[in-house]
Design a protein with these regions (language model features):
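A conserved beta-strand-loop-helix scaffold within acyl/acetyltransferase catalytic domains
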Residues: 1-75, 156-162
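Generic signal for short, ordered secondary-structure residues
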Residues: 6-9, 70, 87-88, 132, ...
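Short, hydrophobic/aromatic alpha-helical segments in well-folded domains
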Residues: 7, 23-30, 83-88, 104-108
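Active-site/acyl-donor-binding loops of N-acyltransferases
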Residues: 45, 94-162
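Short, flexible segments with low predicted structural confidence
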Residues: 63, 80-81, 137
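Conserved acetyl-CoA-binding loop-helix of GNAT-fold acetyltransferases
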Residues: 74-89, 101
Length: 162
């Protein structure tokens, strides 16, 4: 559990936007309570945990959740890229219709066929004054620019968009 927590922290510490911090216990509780609706998979190198991925299965979706990565090994062993392929493998195996990879690291996700989808965000405070401030602040929040890769031929893309 400590190794998982350290890997989670490596990713968390690099994140530009943080809503809250999870404990390693959270992942194990999710697995225990959600059973097959939650996946938690470890990546090992010489019996040492060097990465983990988690995700939720629901209503024909696989929602990629948090990951943890030992960045010292990521470049040489392409840990994160392997995680993306594993999400795809699990989705095919479980016959899910869509995968949500989340809103970070968009360029590498586009190499496996992911593309950005605009999301609606509803935030409301109980008091009026903070609501006005939130509206102003969130008007400035824009996705980071990235180089969108195209993993499919044009014809295949058109079929995906249907």
């Amino acid at each position: 559990r400590e190794e998982l927590h350290q890997l989670y922290n490596q990713v968390y510490d690099r994140a530009d936007f943080k809503l809250g911090k999870l404990s390693a216990e959270c992942f194990f509780n999710l697995k225990e309570n959600l059973k097959d609706c939650f996946t938690l998979k470890g990546y090992f190198l010489d019996d040492k945990l060097v990465g983990f991925q988690s995700g939720f299965f629901y209503d024909g979706w696989l929602d990629a959740h948090f990951v943890g990565i030992n960045y010292e090994h990521n470049y040489q062993y392409a840990i994160y890229q392997r995680m993306l392929y594993e999400y795809i493998r699990m989705a095919i195996e479980r016959k899910v219709e869509r995968i949500s990879f989340g809103r970070t690291a968009m360029e590498i996700k586009s190499t496996v066929g992911a593309f950005p989808v605009d999301l609606k965000c509803y935030i409301r405070h109980r008091k009026k004054a903070p609501n006005a401030l939130l509206k102003l602040l969130f008007g400035y929040v824009k996705p980071s620019e990235f180089n969108q890769r195209v993993a499919f031929k044009k014809r295949e893309l058109e079929e995906l968009e249907m």
